[in-house]
Amino acid sequence: MANLKEIRAKVASIKSTQKITRAMQMVAASKMRRAQERMAQGRPYADNMRRVIAHLVQANPEYKHRYMVDRPVKRVGYIIVSSDRGLAGGLNINLFKKVVQHVKAQQEQSIEVQFALIGQKAVSFFKNYGGKVLGATTQIGDAPSLEQLTGSVQVMLDAFDKGELDRIYLVSNGFVNAMTQKPKVEQLVPLAPAEEGDDLNRTYGWDYIYEPEAEELLNGLLVRYIESMVYQGVIENVACEQSARMVAMKAATDNAGQLIKDLQLIYNKLRQAAITQEISEIVGGAAAV
């Protein structure tokens, strides 16, 4: 059994670690709130762009853009959004399980898969998992910009334009609340079929005059919209990362507190036993005299 000095040293070490985990919990909570604000700020941009695209499509029904037309699926691309750092519980592990499950379903249908990776954790995972990686982006930070992500998006769109991919998916973590994050798979290209009530399925009674031509404008808008969807996915993933880290650090802080209590109990018992032993020896010595 450890002696009193060893237990005191262990308690001091755990208390030091507890201070670190408590500080990390507070930092993660602050970063999570900022990421949530960026999520809220980015949604109106994507929503308004989707409405303009919907109007352009309805105003020019004869023009079928390649990003809105389904074709036989033989090759599929995945844009995987992960974090650069760990200490976020099972956030990335659950995401990769979702990817592997989805990829396996594609491969069972003899569909080839390719990847574009965002985040160091995804790069490390697919280095072991294998697969054809078209591009990778790491070190995006807690406040990523759209410019950091365009490379990974463009390499997938180029492959789609060349006929090397027939469908592109975005895989990222969805923010439910501060305690819950769920991995999700969204179809990016071709744009997923419109659901009832969706902007792409809505009839508008107003008209615009477009400069330049609507077809040229649609070409640029669709690329920009796809980039904004990936950006929104990355921002949401940052919020998920920080919330998962906040929860993980809170659990670590609580566990450290419980461990300190257990060690202090052991310390007190050992100290009590040592004092009792000393008293017994003194009493025994006095009796002998």
UniProtKB/Swiss-Prot annotation:
A GO BP entry: proton motive force-driven plasma membrane ATP synthesis
InterPro entries: ATP_synth_F1_ATPase_gsu, ATP_synth_F1_gsu, ATP_synth_F1_gsu_CS
CDD domains according to UniProt: F1-ATPase_gamma
Subcellular location: Cell inner membrane
Chain's gene name: atpG
One of the record's GO molecular function terms: ATP binding
Superkingdom, natural source: Bacteria
CC terms in the record's Gene Ontology section: plasma membrane; proton-transporting ATP synthase complex
Annotated protein name in UniProt: ATP synthase gamma chain
